[in-house]
């Protein structure tokens, strides 16, 4: 079976279903990673499990990130009539612990290092992620025309509003002036004029963590959402519903995990 050919057919189906460009891009990248891994190997359940274990042990992958890969792969396997290859997803709480959380001191060390190195774009990315709780993929909604105290974020077919603090608002406007950005994306690859690949941002922040002597395991795809959530709950400890709304969680129970993290931190201080 030619998996690359099947992938093209699968992507065509996703386009017919009017999936967003970001979703299709993610599907293609994730399935391509699996195809690369399987080269020279037999396509069977054992190989899929080995790939799953590989994802589960890489520093930058937490359970929810690994599950994103597995859900996409399972969908692809069903498309090619290989349901026998489908694997179980990982329980979210398995690795969602304080061990992988970004502390306030870590966050501010990253900011100081980005500023010290003159990395204006990394500094701005850190400020946006840490102060709004958006996903890295949602940076594309930060456009010159949209800069305001309240901004709309659309993801997974849902729209939500986020608040932008005045000092961050000023920083965004100053950045645009200094870099002569008059319209469109604020954070973008200067070579392609398009959004940075998510993996590029992860790598850059990991590298920055090394420079700042911050544990790289604490700088993962959702580290800054976790950080924002815990800071929010320190200020509004009983407003889990409000936090769920800001983060775009459909269930309050999903946001409740951050309460557990905050309680764990309190226990460590005793």
Q: Could you say what each language-model-derived stretch is?
A:
Residues 1-270:
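Conserved catalytic core of the tyrosine transesterase superfamily
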């Amino acid at each position: 079976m030619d998996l690359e050919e099947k992938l093209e057919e699968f992507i065509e189906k996703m386009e017919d279903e009017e999936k967003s460009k970001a979703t299709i891009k993610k599907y293609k990248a994730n399935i391509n990673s699996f195809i690369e891994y399987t080269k020279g190997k037999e396509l069977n359940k054992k190989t899929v499990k080995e790939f799953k274990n590989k994802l589960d042990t890489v520093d930058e992958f937490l359970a929810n990130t690994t599950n994103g890969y597995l859900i996409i792969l399972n969908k692809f396997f069903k498309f090619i009539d290989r349901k026998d290859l489908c694997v179980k997803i990982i329980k979210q709480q398995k690795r969602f612990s304080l061990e992988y959380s970004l502390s306030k001191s870590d966050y501010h060390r990253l900011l100081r290092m980005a500023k010290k190195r003159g990395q204006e774009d990394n500094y701005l990315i850190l400020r946006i992620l840490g102060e709004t709780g958006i996903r890295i993929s949602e940076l594309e909604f930060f456009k010159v025309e949209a800069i305001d105290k309240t901004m709309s974020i659309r993801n997974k077919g849902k729209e939500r509003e986020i608040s932008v603090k005045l000092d961050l608002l000023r920083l965004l406007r100053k950045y645009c002036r200094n870099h002569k950005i008059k319209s469109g994306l604020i954070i973008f690859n200067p070579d392609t004029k398009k959004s940075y690949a998510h993996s590029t941002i992860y790598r850059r922040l990991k590298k920055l963590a090394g420079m700042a002597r911050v544990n790289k395991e604490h700088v993962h795809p959702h580290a800054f959402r976790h950080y924002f959530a815990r800071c929010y709950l320190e200020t509004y400890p009983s407003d889990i519903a409000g936090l769920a709304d800001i983060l775009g969680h459909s269930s309050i129970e999903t946001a409740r995990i951050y309460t557990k993290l905050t309680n764990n931190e309190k226990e460590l201080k005793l």
